[in-house]
Amino acid sequence: MHRGYDGLREHDFNEAHFEALKAARTGWPMVDACVTMLRETGWLNFRMRAMLVSVAAYPLWLHWRPVGEWLATQFLDYEPGIHWSQLQMQSGTTGINTTRVYNPIKQAQDHDPHGRFVRQWLPTMRQVPDTWLFEPWLMPDTMQAHLGVFTGCNSYTPSALVQPVVDLAQATREAKQLLHSRRQTDEVKAAKKAVVDKHASRKNWGTRSATSRRSPASKKADKQQLGFDF
């Protein structure tokens, strides 16, 4: 969509990060639970789809195309016209959309506060207390030994809790800096108008309120889409 972002992530693609994402072994429980559910059911709500792409694009620093090709094989409702524009938007490479970076720990705390969803799809997490459910790597060694679960395991045994593949805060911060630096280049700035002219709505660009023009029925549907009652 925006050629100014070509080369931003492609040459730094980390295959180990990609494999960890596809295997539901990133170490972030909400991400791994979502991938597990997606593989089993072929469906996720919109917020969690956006979170997966955001995690792939920022802390894991994966290019949107391989991630999108993989997700396309997982979604039962895959629709190319929606899918690929969303991949680029959530990756911050359209040049015309606000950058949205989803913190998988905060998403879990906000949308699965009691851990029902995570525990449903990650059996290993069922015995982890709420205090450490979304950050199990912080659990004291004595507690791990008591529960019979251990972080940092590389094996796929039932007792293995995976360490995060990267430091979330540091990796996200570095990704934002790289994206911001690219946005300041003359090439990206010059191409923005062409992207707006081709892809953005012609009516009142930049002035419309998304919430003000939407019907109550649409807002109700959004609320249902963001829920975890499956």
Residue spans for each PLM region:
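C-terminal catalytic domain of photolyase/cryptochrome flavoproteins
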Residues: 1-230
